[in-house]
Amino acid sequence: MKRCCEGVGLPCLFKGVGMASSRPPKYLLVFDFDGTIINESSDDSIVRAAPGQALPEHIRQSFREGFYNEYMQRVLAYMGDQGVKMGDFKAVYENIPLSPGMPDLFQFLSKNHELFEIILISDANMFGIECKLRAAGFYSLFRKIFSNPSSFDKRGYFTLGPYHSHKCLDCPANTCKRKILTEYLAERAQEEVEFERVFYVGDGANDFCPSVTLTSADVAFPRKGYPMHQMTQEMEKKQPGTFQATVVPWESATEVARYLQELLKKKC
């Protein structure tokens, strides 16, 4: 199946994971992080490292809809002022629980890695994602990770930046996952890698935006009862047939693994 879309050259973390086979993978598998790979929002989780495991009212009241990245910059600055260091953040990230069944799904993908190219698109941050994936032992599964840049400055403060700018009216100002996904597919097409199918595993409203671009050959895996699932249901009710991808809701990621396993059996 040939895919064509405009825009290339999106900056990202390239991990250079080698495939066992010289043939390119058949399928692209896209993961979200917060509420998908992990069972929490990592931005909420890190508050456990703050004094009293809580934020002051003036920080919490500073949140503006659509500008969550800016809000988190203020949260991290406050935590830096309170003496929270890299090791404190790292410990929290490493101990965030994975979503139900996620280890099973990752084990399945590890055994079938030559068939799947796996990327992660998240509105969290690079440091937190790397900490958790390394601790869980699944970091090497991902070819590329797209997320907000983060680092520790000379003071030891945890700093966060926006991923990019975009013109999408449906997404937060710092990240549009649809833009990231379409540019990634275009980049891979220029490298003569065309995927038979795209699978998207997510939970949030910002995962709905890229899933709308999926074709009838693709599969969207929204977490059952979460915003992405609710929005696909609403679109199907109001505009039947507009959402083209097959929708497979999940409560446990084991269900995603079973679906993919059945797909591979049919292909054999």
UniProtKB/Swiss-Prot annotation:
Induction field: Up-regulated 5-fold during chondrocyte terminal differentiation.
Location(s), subcellular: Extracellular vesicle
Catalytic activity: phosphoethanolamine + H2O = ethanolamine + phosphate; phosphocholine + H2O = choline + phosphate
Tissue-specificity statement: Expressed at sites of mineralization in bone and cartilage. Highly expressed in hypertrophic chondrocytes compared to non-chondrogenic tissues. Expressed in chondrocytes but not in heart, liver, lung, kidney, spleen, muscle, adipose tissues not duodenum. In diaphyseal cortical bone, it is expressed in the osteoid layer of the periosteum, forming surfaces of growing osteons, and newly formed osteocytes, whereas it is not expressed in the endosteum and closed osteons. In growth plate cartilage, it is limited to the early hypertrophic chondrocytes and the ossification groove of Ranvier.
UniProt entry keywords in alphabetical sequence: Hydrolase, Magnesium, Metal-binding, Mineral balance
Annotated residues for binding of substrate: 43, 123
A GO MF label: phosphoethanolamine phosphatase activity
A GO CC annotation given for this chain: extracellular matrix
EC numbers, comma separated: 3.1.3.75
Matches recorded under NCBIfam families: DKMTPPase-SF (TIGR01489), HAD-SF-IB (TIGR01488)
Family membership: Belongs to the HAD-like hydrolase superfamily. PHOSPHO family.
Record's protein name: Phosphoethanolamine/phosphocholine phosphatase
Annotated source species: Gallus gallus (Chicken)
Gene coding for it: PHOSPHO1
